[in-house]
Amino acid sequence: MGRGRVQLKRIENKINRQVTFSKRRAGLMKKAHEISVLCDAEVALVVFSHKGKLFEYSTDSCMEKILERYERYSYAERQLIAPESDSNTNWSMEYNRLKAKIELLERNQRHYLGEDLQAMSPKELQNLEQQLDTALKHIRSRKNQLMYDSINELQRKEKAIQEQNSMLSKQIKERENVLRAQQEQWDEQNHGHNMPPPPPPQQHQIQHPYMLSHQPSPFLNMGGLYQEEDQMAMRRNDLDLSLEPVYNCNLGCFAA
């Protein structure tokens, strides 16, 4: 006898229902992975348990991209099928879409922070680990790039400061050389053109009135000769005549 068709219905026993859910969920995840690998298809699988726990599978961990693509496709189809649909319905669908996207982002954020990991399968944990490793590599690469750019900027500023210091030092040396050359030129001019010493100040001597009265005052006659010698000779003759009797008297006294 052949095996009859098993009727599908809800399992009443909670333990059996939980075991069956775990087995079927694992098989479903395996089938989704197989079809994505064998057929090169983009697969997104979302499963909620009866307790509200979320289980998902996505090709290459791109659940958000697949869901956004699905939303665009379904929205375009709805626009083609019912172009005159009510605007309220469109707003309601848009609200539900954004709400689901926000919930997905919040859940991924909790996973990135290491929260709510109990409901994740080993495959999901592996995908999360790969995502974190990739993100960590990007972060380290960006940090290293910023540090490298900062070092290059500091080196550029240092080089500019060194060039400025060199230019200032060169200008200072050139200025010192110019001043030194000017000083040497001034020294050579002073040594080469020595001025005679200034004359000493004149001393005012007090002279006797007799000397002043008898000081010769030469004058020029018509012939261009001075009469100083004639006047001096006349004065000596007068002096000899006046002193001769005195000398004779004294000599007579000594003879007696």
Curated annotation (Swiss-Prot):
MF (Gene Ontology): DNA-binding transcription factor activity; protein dimerization activity; RNA polymerase II transcription regulatory region sequence-specific DNA binding
One BP term from GO: positive regulation of transcription by RNA polymerase II
Localization, UniProt: Nucleus
Taxonomic superkingdom: Eukaryota
InterPro entries reported for this sequence: MADS-box/MEF2_TF, MEF2-like_N, TF_Kbox, TF_MADSbox, TF_MADSbox_sf
GO cellular component, one term: nucleus
Quaternary assembly: Homodimer capable of binding to CArG-box sequences.
Protein name (database record): Floral homeotic protein APETALA 1 A
UniProt source species: Brassica oleracea var. botrytis
Record gene name: AP1A
